[in-house]
Swiss-Prot record:
Keywords: Chaperone, Cytoplasm, Ribosome biogenesis, rRNA processing. The lineage of its organism: Bacteria, Pseudomonadati, Pseudomonadota, Gammaproteobacteria, Pseudomonadales. This is Ribosome maturation factor RimM. An accessory protein needed during the final step in the assembly of 30S ribosomal subunit, possibly for assembly of the head region. Essential for efficient processing of 16S rRNA. May be needed both before and after RbfA during the maturation of 16S rRNA. It has affinity for free ribosomal 30S subunits but not for 70S ribosomes. SUPFAM superfamilies: PRC-barrel domain, Translation proteins. It comes from Marinobacter nauticus (strain ATCC 700491 / DSM 11845 / VT8) (Marinobacter aquaeolei).
Length: 175
């Protein structure tokens, strides 16, 4: 999930499904069908914001399919393909202490326990065993390398300071 201002991206429309205007959705929520808990969406497509309501949805194989209010034709549905699905950030459930949404980690400065700047969290990857921080170099980092750092709280990630916009990791900069 990524955040823009007071909205968080929770998925994207990938393609049409069937002939009655249903759409396939790639969900960024965990679990995947958690996206169906949000009824009022804002779609962002080609720079345009489109408020729309989720009428119904369900799991279909490994993915999610949805029907949006006012869309009951395959060709009309096709015009929404590629849209980001956004919801107000305030609607996201509060997480337990020490847990974070990905959008909260994106943009944090990353430092080693020795105080060396490795860069800034650009985005995260889901690998199956654990999430991975993709850290891009910044003007203040020790070099210009991109780093992939496992997001393992208490093992690799020692501290997350959202207010200070920084993260401390136990990570060898040479790795």
């Amino acid at each position: 999930m990524t955040q823009n201002s007071q909205e968080t991206v929770i998925g994207r429309i990938t393609s049409v499904f069937g002939v009655k205007g249903w759409l396939k959705v790639f969900s960024y929520t965990d679990p995947k069908d958690g996206i169906l808990n949000y009824r009022d969406w804002t779609l962002l497509l080609d720079g345009k914001r489109i408020p729309i309501r989720l009428e119904e949805g369900r799991r279909q194989g490994q993915g999610i399919v949805v029907r949006l209010k006012g869309i009951d034709d395959r060709e009309v549905a096709r015009t929404y393909c590629g849209a980001e699905i956004r919801v107000p950030t305030e609607q996201l459930p509060e997480l337990p202490e020490g847990e974070f949404y990905w959008h909260q980690l994106e943009g944090l400065d990353v430092f080693t326990v020795e105080g060396e700047c490795l860069g800034k969290v650009h985005h995260l990857l889901e690998t199956g065993s654990n999430d991975v921080l993709v850290v891009h170099a910044t003007a203040g980092s020790i070099d210009q390398r991109e780093r992939l750092i496992p997001y393992l709280p208490d093992q690799v990630v020692q501290q997350v300071d959202l207010k200070g916009s920084r993260m401390v990791v136990d990570w060898d900069p040479e790795f």
